[in-house]
UniProtKB/Swiss-Prot annotation:
Similarity comment: family membership: Belongs to the thioredoxin family.
Gene3D superfamilies reported in the protein's UniProt record: Glutaredoxin (3.40.30.10)
An MF annotation (GO) of this entry: protein-disulfide reductase activity
Record-annotated Thioredoxin domain positions: 2-107
Source organism: Synechocystis sp. (strain ATCC 27184 / PCC 6803 / Kazusa)
Superkingdom per UniProt: Bacteria
Disulfide-bond pairs as recorded: C31-C34
Any one of the GO BP annotations: cell redox homeostasis
GO CC terms of this entry: cytoplasm; cytosol
Protein name according to UniProt: Thioredoxin-like protein slr1139
Pfam family, one: Thioredoxin
């Protein structure tokens, strides 16, 4: 499964009631570190898309999801599992370190 870009209107539907864990990548077009992280997020979506739903949400036009997830800076990640927020991370992170973080919550990584 590829990376799916969502908006505030789709946030609840795409993150809640899912059969697999959901990773939400919060980003901004003006954010340099976000651009650096984008390939890692895309690779994770490609490599684990059958077991992990990966969503991309631009922060500026989507303030409701940003507030709901208490995102204070970008890039930011939120991992939902069984409708619960189980992992948060703010700031740029390299793919190996991101996989390490995800591995703590996901047994298939």
């Amino acid at each position: 499964m590829s990376l799916l870009e969502i908006t505030d209107a789709e946030f609840e539907q795409e993150t809640q009631g899912q059969t697999k864990p959901v990773l939400v990548y919060f980003w901004a077009s003006w954010c340099g570190p976000c651009r650096l992280m984008a390939p890692a997020i895309q690779a994770i979506a490609k490599d684990y898309g059958d077991k992990l739903k990966v969503l991309k949400l631009e922060v500026d036009p989507n303030p409701a999801a940003v507030a709901q997830c208490k995102v204070e800076g970008v890039p930011a990640l939120r991992l939902f599992k069984n409708n619960e927020l189980v992992m948060t991370h703010e700031g740029a992170i390299a793919k190996p370190k991101l996989l390490e973080l995800l591995k703590e919550e996901l047994d298939f990584i």
